[in-house]
Every structure is written in C-alpha cells, then in structure tokens.
Amino acid sequence: MGQLGALLHLVDPTLPIGGFNHSNGLETFVQQGKVNSRASLEEYVQTQLMQNWIYNDGAYLSLAFDAMANHDLDRLLALDQELAASKIARESREGSYKLGVRLLKIFIRYENHPLLSEFQQAVSEKRCQGYFPIVFAMVAQAMNLDKAETLYAFYYNAAVGVVTNGVKLVPLSQMDGQDILFALRTPLAQAVENSLNPDLDWLGAATLASDIRSMQHEQLYTRLYMS
C-alpha cells in the first residue's frame, strides 16, 4: 500500500507545480478549429500518446528510470540535455523544466536519495535544466515504484491534463471528458508496453503539427494557458 500512496502523491493534480497552466499547443488547435468536438479531442489525445509522448517524454522517462536505478548521474544529465534538444517550442520547453524543478523541490524533502541532491546541485550549477519527465522518473525510482506503473501514471496524468483543458476550451461536457478517458485505457496500456524498452532509433521523433501549434501559441491574441 505504501507504493500506491507514493505513486498517487507523485501524480496528485493538487501538487503546486503549475501543470494546469499548460496546454502544450492544444489551445492553438482549438482556436484554429482543428479540435472542436469530443471525437476530435479524443483523436488528438490518442495521437499525442502514440505518436509523441511514447517517443519523447515517456521514452526519456523510461531511460531516466533505468539510469536512476543504475546510479548513473552522467546518464541522467545527458538525457536531460537530449530532451531539451527535442523540445522545439520555447513555451513547452520552458514549461517542462519549470514543472520539473518544482517537482524536485517538493520530493527532495521526503526522499533521502543522494542522486536527487546531486541532480538538484547540477540544476543550480546550470549543468542541466531538470525537465519534468527526468525528475518524475528519478523521484519514482527513489521511491522504489514499479516502472510500468510509473509510466502508466505518467501517461494517464498527461492525458487527464489534455482532456481537462480540452473540455474547458472547446467546450465539452464533463461526461465527454470521462468517456474519452475511459476509451484511453487500452491505448495507455499499449503505450506503457512500448515505452518499457524504448527504441532509440525513434527517440525524439518530431510531431510537426504539434510543434508548430506550440510555437504559434506565443502569438495568439487571447490565451488562457502559458503554452
């Protein structure tokens, strides 16, 4: 039960890290009319999951989890730098490391793991940024969480964020949002399976439409979100 409690704490939407402030380009898709219904929002989330997250944030989380288990700080720093290079849009890039730094600040108070302290020192010395998936993986491994369950929780948390924002932006009913999350159960499980041992040849695969909308977000006339 202790691991379940730790995992629920790690993905608690009330964590004061500011995740609710970011749409990562979804707001642009909605304003351009690309996402305008339950069906299009569900398609958007599944596309992000299976064509973006499993090759980017999820893949780097998986690799960072293994590096943390091997007590390999150099590998963690390298993964953080590689992830930075894969995040083309400034708002999404800055949003990710701000979330990561805040997450680290919270959990370093509870987990007495030397690599967390060393990584925090590396962030303060600007040897890395501290991107959210990297920190998430480090904290999860420090708490001895199961890797597959950590990945599922990470993906589910990301999906909930997208659906919550989409319901607000389109707008849709709350039940539409719940129906989308229910439909994601099988794709989420498949994403976890694909991410346990990431294909390095696909690491950092670009999702151009999403990257472009994330960059266009900076120029929107009105915005509810920071990215």
Curated annotation (Swiss-Prot):
Q: Which GO terms describe its cellular component?
A: cytoplasm
Q: Where in the cell is it found?
A: Cytoplasm
Regions crossing the membrane: none
Organism's domain of life?
Bacteria
For this protein, the record's InterPro entries field holds: UreF, UreF_sf
Q: What does this protein do, in the record's words? A: Required for maturation of urease via the functional incorporation of the urease nickel metallocenter.
Family, per the entry?
Answer: Belongs to the UreF family.
User: What does the annotation say about its assembly with partners?
Assistant: UreD, UreF and UreG form a complex that acts as a GTP-hydrolysis-dependent molecular chaperone, activating the urease apoprotein by helping to assemble the nickel containing metallocenter of UreC. The UreE protein probably delivers the nickel.
| Name of protein | Urease accessory protein UreF
Record organism:
Actinobacillus pleuropneumoniae
Q: What is the lineage of its organism?
A: Bacteria, Pseudomonadati, Pseudomonadota, Gammaproteobacteria, Pasteurellales
Quote the gene name from the UniProt entry: ureF
